[in-house]
Design a protein with these regions (language model features):
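Solvent-exposed, non-transmembrane regions of membrane-associated and secreted proteins
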Residues: 1-85, 90-97, 107-158
């Protein structure tokens, strides 16, 4: 995921709760790797929030939260389940100030990584959205990754 740093919001998300899929996981701020990709926590049990993007309390822009779908310590990560997201599902995000933000799923996309343009998902000035991202599709051993990204887009309710 290619990302470009911007200003850092003051109140980061700390927890992601998606009851329909049994997801309840911590979220930590992450940045950008040396090759310009969004940094993802090594353990699939923890999600990363793109700290140069928008936070749930922001009036505009996308809040991007991503996690690996598996890792050595967590063979099946919680975000692996987002492939089963359905339009209308509710997702809750808690921030470090203790505020809860509820979102409703608008879409779930399965996009081949070779065809993926992530720039629109990282928008800082678009209509507020929650964007969840993980890997999906088939394992590609020669690339040491999966063939697709699974991307869930949700709109704020509160």
């Amino acid at each position: 995921m290619t990302a470009t740093p911007g200003a850092v919001p003051e109140v980061p998300p700390i927890r992601l709760d998606y009851p329909t899929l049994g997801i309840d996981m911590p979220v930590i701020p992450t940045g950008v790797t040396e090759d310009g990709q969004m940094e993802i926590p090594g353990d699939a049990a923890t999600a990363g929030w793109y700290r140069y993007g928008k936070a749930p309390a922001d009036a505009v822009g996308h809040t991007v939260i991503a996690a690996h779908n598996s890792s050595p310590d967590t063979p099946v990560g919680p975000l692996n389940a987002i492939a089963g997201s359905r339009t209308g599902d509710e997702i809750r995000v808690e921030d470090s100030a203790g505020h809860d933000y509820t979102y409703r799923v608008l879409s779930v996309e399965h996009v081949n990584k070779n065809e993926l343009n992530l720039e629109p998902y990282f928008s800082r000035d678009a209509t507020p959205r929650l964007v969840l991202v993980t890997c999906g599709g088939e394992w590609v051993p020669e690339r040491n990754t999966y063939s697709d990204n699974v991307i869930v887009i949700a709109e704020p309710l509160t």
